[in-house]
Curated annotation (Swiss-Prot):
Domain topic, free-text comment: The LIR motif (LC3-interacting region) is required for the interaction with ATG8 family proteins MAP1LC3A, MAP1LC3B, MAP1LC3C and GABARAPL1. Required for proteolytic activation and delipidation of ATG8 proteins.
Task of the protein: Cysteine protease that plays a key role in autophagy by mediating both proteolytic activation and delipidation of ATG8 family proteins. Required for canonical autophagy (macroautophagy), non-canonical autophagy as well as for mitophagy. The protease activity is required for proteolytic activation of ATG8 family proteins: cleaves the C-terminal amino acid of ATG8 proteins MAP1LC3A, MAP1LC3B, MAP1LC3C, GABARAPL1, GABARAPL2 and GABARAP, to reveal a C-terminal glycine. (Microbial infection) Mediates cleavage of an ATG8 protein homolog coded in the genome of cytopathogenic bovine viral diarrhea virus (BVDV).
Documented EC number(s): 3.4.22.-
Protein name: Cysteine protease ATG4B
Enzyme class: hydrolase
InterPro entries: ATG4_LIR, Papain-like_cys_pep_sf, Peptidase_C54, Peptidase_C54_cat
Compartments in which it is found: Cytoplasm; Cytoplasm, Cytosol; Cytoplasmic vesicle, Autophagosome; Endoplasmic reticulum
Sequence similarity: Belongs to the peptidase C54 family.
Gene giving rise to this polypeptide: ATG4B
Keywords: Acetylation, Autophagy, Cytoplasm, Cytoplasmic vesicle, Disulfide bond, Endoplasmic reticulum, Glycoprotein, Hydrolase, Isopeptide bond, Mitochondrion, Phosphoprotein, Protease, Protein transport, S-nitrosylation, Thiol protease, Transport, Ubl conjugation, Ubl conjugation pathway
Biological classification of the source: Eukaryota, Metazoa, Chordata, Craniata, Vertebrata
C-alpha cells in the first residue's frame, strides 16, 4: 500500500519492525538506552514525542483551499514535530512522559492546541501553509527543510507564551555572537517590519550590533535550526559520525529531512540506522477544542518507530537544537567544538564567534523571496525539484 494512502484505521501495528536485539546503544534525542534491558523505556520515550501526520477533513486552508494535506504536507508535519519537541522541552521538560488515558498538565494541552488543524492555532498546517505564501510557496506546494524552518521562525514571533528566540543558521555557519544578541533581545526576532526600510542592516529582526541599553535582558530559550546539505545526490559518508553525534547531545531536537518520496522526523539512531517518526499516515482531523483535554491518542506513535540506513538519507536536511539557558548554549558550543577532534569525521557546519566579513547577515537573505540571495539559498537547501518526489494520491 502506498504510504500516502495509509490511514490510521488500516494500520496494523504488529507489522512494524521492532528494535533489533543488539548491544549497540540506542540514542533518542540526547538519551542513551540499551535495547536489551530498556526496550519499554525506549518505546515510552518515542511515544511521548508529538507525532503529526497527514490529516483529512479539517477546515479549508484559507477558507477555500485544501481540507487535507495528504501527498504534500509531509515536510510541514515534520516541521511541526521538531518544533513541538522544542515546546515540550520549554514547557514540560525533556524527561516528561505521556501516558495513555492519564490526565496531563495544562501546559501539555496548550502545546498540543498550538498545532491543531485550525486557522487560529499558532503552528497549524493552516498557518504554515499561509505563511509559506509569503515565502513564494503556493498552498499545497511541497516544502524543503530550509523553507519550513524559515516559516516556523516567523510564526514563533506570535507565540508570546513560549517567548522563544528562533535562529535559522545559514551558509553552514553558526555565529555565536548573533545568537547571544538574539537571545538577549526583547525585540521581534523575525522579519524587519519593526524597523524602517532604510535603517541599518538587521540580524534576526534587530539592528546588527544592537545590544540595548542598561542591564542585559534575560536569556530567551533558543531554538536553533541549521539547514544543511551533506552531499550532492547522496550523503557524504564522512558526515555520518557528526550526524549521529548530534542525536547524543542533550540539546538535540532531532533532524528533519528524508529520502526520495518522503520526509521524516529523525529522533535518534542505533548502529548505522536512523530512527524516525513517519508522517505518511492519513488520520481524521481532531475537532477543535478550546479546553482540556484534547483527544490526543492519535498524536502519539504507539508502535515501534521507523528505521533507515544513514546512507539512504537525502543530503538536504535541517538539524535542530534547544538551549533553555545560556549555560545550555555554552555547553552546546563546547560539544560542537570537540566534534572537530573526531577522527575521520567531517564537521557538518562551522561554529564561529563573529559573523565572517564575506557573509551577509543570514536573516536578511530570507526577508523576501524577491532577493536573489534568498532564491539561491532555497535552491541549495530545498531539493524538492530533484531529490524529492511528491507522493501521488
Amino acid at each position: 500500500m502506498d504510504a500516502a494512502t495509509l490511514t490510521y484505521d488500516t494500520l496494523r501495528f504488529a507489522e512494524f519492525e521492532d528494535f533489533p536485539e543488539t548491544s549497540e546503544p540506542v540514542w533518542i534525542l540526547g538519551r542513551k538506552y540499551s535495547v536489551l534491558t530498556e526496550k519499554d523505556e525506549i518505546l515510552a520515550d518515542v511515544a511521548s514525542r508529538l507525532w503529526f501526520t497527514y490529516r483529512k477533513n479539517f477546515p479549508a486552508i484559507g477558507g477555500t483551499g485544501p481540507t487535507s494535506d495528504t501527498g504534500w504536507g509531509c515536510m510541514l508535519r515534520c516541521g511541526q514535530m521538531i518544533f513541538a519537541q522544542a515546546l515540550v522541552c520549554r514547557h514540560l521538560g525533556r524527561d516528561w512522559r505521556w501516558t495513555q488515558r492519564k490526565r496531563q498538565p495544562d501546559s501539555y494541552c496548550s502545546v498540543l492546541q498550538a498545532f491543531l488543524d485550525r486557522k487560529d492555532s499558532c503552528y497549524s498546517i493552516h498557518q504554515i501553509a499561509q505563511m509559506g505564501v509569503g515565502e513564494g510557496k503556493s498552498i499545497g506546494q511541497w516544502y524543503g527543510p530550509n523553507t519550513v524552518a524559515q516559516v516556523l521562525k516567523k510564526l514563533a514571533v506570535f507565540d508570546t507564551w513560549s517567548a522563544l528566540a528562533v535562529h535559522v543558521a545559514m551558509d553552514n555557519t553558526v555565529v555565536m555572537a548573533d545568537i547571544r544578541r538574539l537571545c538577549r533581545s526583547s525585540l521581534p526576532c523575525a522579519g524587519a517590519e519593526a524597523f524602517p526600510a532604510d535603517s541599518e542592516r538587521h540580524c534576526n529582526g534587530f539592528p546588527a550590533g544592537a545590544e540595548g541599553g542598561g542591564r542585559a535582558a534575560p536569556w530567551r530559550p533558543l531554538v536553533l535550526l541549521i539547514p544543511l546539505r551533506l552531499g550532492l545526490a547522496d550523503v557524504n559518508a564522512a558526515y555520518a559520525g557528526t550526524l549521529k553525534h548530534c542525536f547524543r547531545m542533550p540539546q538535540s531536537l532531532g533532524v528533519i529531512g528524508g529520502k526520495p518520496n518522503s520526509a521524516h522526523y529523525f529522533i535518534g539512531y542505533v548502529g548505522e540506522e536512523l530512527i524516525y517518526l513517519d508522517p505518511h499516515t492519513t488520520q481524521p482531523a481532531v475537532a477543535a477544542a478550546d479546553r482540556c483535554p484534547v483527544p490526543d491518542e492519535s498524536f502519539h506513535c504507539q508502535h515501534p518507530p521507523g528505521r533507515m540506513s544513514i546512507a539512504e538519507l537525502d543530503p538536504s536536511i535541517a538539524v535542530g537544537f534547544f538551549c533553555e539557558t545560556e549555560d545550555d548554549f555554552n555547553d552546546w558550543c563546547q560539544q560542537v567544538s570537540k566534534l572537530s577532534l573526531l577522527g575521520g569525521a567531517l564537521p557538518m557546519f562551522e561554529l564561529v564567534e563573529q559573523q565572517p566579513s564575506h557573509l551577509a547577515c543570514p536573516d536578511v537573505l530570507n526577508l523576501s523571496l524577491d532577493s536573489s540571495d534568498a532564491e539561491r539559498l532555497e535552491r541549495f537547501f530545498d531539493s524538492e525539484d530533484e531529490d524529492f518526489e511528491i507522493l501521488s494520491l
